[in-house]
Amino acid sequence: NYYYFFNQRGNVYAPLRFSPSKELDFFIKSNPKILFLRDPRDVAVSAFHSFGKTHPLPKSSKSRKVFLERRKRMNHLGINKFSLEFLREIVMPVYKEYAQFKKENHNLIYIKYEDFALDVKGTIDSIISFLKLRVNNYDLENLVNKASPITEKINTNSHKRSGKPNQYFESLDKELIDFISNEYSDVLSELNFDLINWKL
């Protein structure tokens, strides 16, 4: 049934897993867009467990050596110091661009991972409506059943640990959560992520 989902030419059906770029301006402005983001604090927690614990090792010896050195440093830092460094240097500069991208683009549906995880069917229905797709109930139910990102139990040895939203509550120190919420309040607010302040 792919014929009613996809055009054979003229469109790109793929995630853009990097910051918006000027080279893509024309494409971005002239086509409908799905902006799908996870809470950056959970991104940091997930990165720590993935790259620090469970991510498969690269096959080449040179890449494996670099990877293991990075993994050793991450575990030495611990989850709090790593998360702050990772957010400052990698995640939040990109999310700042995405926040601006969201403000400037109208032909766009913005979806938070957290909303998707808690309401898979409702989120998929919204995407179908936004893209004006025709999807029969059988295909829709199949997609919903396969798409849920949440696992029943947290498996610390699995690359996919749990998929549950707001894991940073349990993983990061309260003081760090407050600091991140204050330092990046503009970006978090624009992207509709909660501003947590434990002192209130």
Label every PLM stretch briefly.
Residues N1-R70, F82-I109, E175, F179-E183, ...:
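PAPS-dependent sulfotransferase catalytic domain
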Residues S21-K22, F116-T123, N157-K160:
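Short acidic alpha-helix initiation/capping motifs at coil-to-helix transition points
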Residues L37, A117-L118, E170-K174:
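Short, solvent-exposed loop/helix junctions and linker helices
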Residues V43-A47, T123-I127, L143:
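Alpha-helical scaffold elements adjacent to nucleotide-binding pockets in ATP/GTP-utilizing enzyme cores
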Residues K65-I79, D115, V120:
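Acidic, glycine-rich loop-and-strand cores that form catalytic or ligand-binding grooves
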Residues K81-L84, A99-K102, S129-L200:
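PAPS-dependent sulfotransferases, especially Golgi type II membrane carbohydrate sulfotransferases
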Residues E104-L131:
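Phosphate-binding beta-loop-alpha motif at adenosine-nucleotide cofactor sites
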